C-alpha cells in the first residue's frame, strides 16, 4: 500500500466497513468488523452457539454487500429453510444501521454446535432484497448450498450478476468479513481474480479479529497496489418505535384487542429484534 493511499486507517476500530480497490486489476473489496453490534445482539438474544454463528455470518455478509451498492437503500439478507432453524435475517439500512434475528422452527429444539451452522437451515433459499428510498424493491433468490453462508452468496453473484465474488466470514473472535469482487465491466481477467482469491484464502480468523484493514491487506497482498478508502461507521440500531407500534395496533381488529384485554388485562408488544416493549 503506497503511503499516499493509506491515510490514517491503521488503528483497529469497532464496527466499521472499509472499501478498497486493486486499481490496476479492476477488482474491489470490502472489509468489515462488527464488535459492538455483535456484543449488543448477543446480550439481547442468548442464542445457541450454532445459531449465533450463523447470525454473525449473515450480519457480516450483509454489511459487506451493502458496501458495494451503487445507490442508497436498505439491504436485507435472509436465508430460510426446512431445518431446525427456520430463518436467519440481517438488515443494513442506508444510514449504516444494522439489525438481525434468528427464527427457530421449534423453540425447544436442540441445536448442537456444528462446523457448518448453515446446515441447521436444511434445504432452502437465500434471498437478497434491496429497497431504495423511492421506487420498487429489487430481489434476487438462489438455493442454499455448501457448508457456509458465503457459499450461497457467492453462488448468487455467479448466477444472477455474473460477477466473480468471494467472501470470508469469521465469527470465532467477534464478527469480521472480507469480500473480493470483480468490478462490472472491468478487465481483471479470471487469472487476476483467482490469484487474489487464492491469496485471500490464506486469511486466518485470528488475523481478521486482530488486524486493522491496512495491516491485513498488506499481509495478504504484499505486492499489489491497493487504494484503501476511509472507514465508514456501522452500528446496531432497531427501527421499532411507539408510533409504529400504535400503527400495528390500529390495524388489528377491535374484537381481537378486546379479547386480549379480557384475558391478560393489558396489551404488551415486544420487538423481536431489540426486545423493547
Residue map of PLM features:
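Interaction interfaces in information-processing and related assembly proteins
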Residues: 11-230
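N-terminal amphipathic/basic-hydrophobic helices that include classical n-h-c signal peptides
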Residues: 1-11
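Cys/His-clustered metal-coordination modules, chiefly Zn-binding fingers
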Residues: 201-277
Amino acid at each position: 500500500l503506497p503511503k499516499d493511499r493509506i491515510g490514517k486507517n491503521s488503528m483497529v476500530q469497532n464496527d466499521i466497513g472499509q472499501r478498497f480497490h486493486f486499481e490496476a486489476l479492476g477488482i474491489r473489496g470490502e472489509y468489515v468488523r462488527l464488535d459492538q453490534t455483535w456484543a449488543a445482539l448477543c446480550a439481547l438474544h442468548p442464542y445457541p452457539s450454532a445459531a449465533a454463528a450463523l447470525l454473525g455470518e449473515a450480519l457480516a455478509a450483509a454489511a459487506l454487500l451493502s458496501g458495494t451498492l451503487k445507490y442508497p437503500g436498505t439491504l436485507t439478507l435472509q436465508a430460510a429453510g426446512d431445518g431446525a432453524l427456520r430463518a436467519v435475517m440481517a438488515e443494513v439500512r442506508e444510514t449504516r444501521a444494522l439489525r438481525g434475528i434468528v427464527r427457530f422452527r421449534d423453540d425447544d429444539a436442540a441445536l448442537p454446535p456444528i462446523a457448518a451452522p448453515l446446515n441447521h437451515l436444511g434445504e432452502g433459499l437465500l434471498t437478497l432484497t434491496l429497497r431504495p428510498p423511492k421506487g420498487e424493491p429489487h430481489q434476487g433468490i438462489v438455493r442454499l448450498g455448501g457448508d457456509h453462508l458465503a457459499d450461497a452468496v457467492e453462488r448468487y453473484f455467479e448466477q444472477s450478476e455474473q460477477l466473480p465474488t468471494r467472501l470470508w466470514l469469521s465469527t470465532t473472535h467477534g464478527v469480521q468479513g472480507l469480500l473480493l469482487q470483480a468490478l462490472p465491466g472491468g478487465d481483471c481477467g479470471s487469472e487476476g481474480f483467482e490469484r487474489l482469491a487464492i491469496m485471500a484464502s490464506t486469511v486466518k480468523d485470528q488475523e481478521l479479529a486482530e488486524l486493522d484493514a491496512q495491516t491485513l491487506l498488506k499481509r495478504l497482498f504484499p505486492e499489489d497496489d491497493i487504494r484503501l478508502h476511509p472507514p465508514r461507521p456501522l452500528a446496531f440500531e432497531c427501527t421499532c418505535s411507539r408510533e409504529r407500534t400504535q400503527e400495528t395496533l390500529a390495524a388489528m381488529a377491535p374484537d381481537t384487542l378486546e379479547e386480549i384485554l379480557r384475558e391478560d388485562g393489558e396489551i404488551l408488544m415486544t420487538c423481536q429484534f431489540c426486545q423493547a416493549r
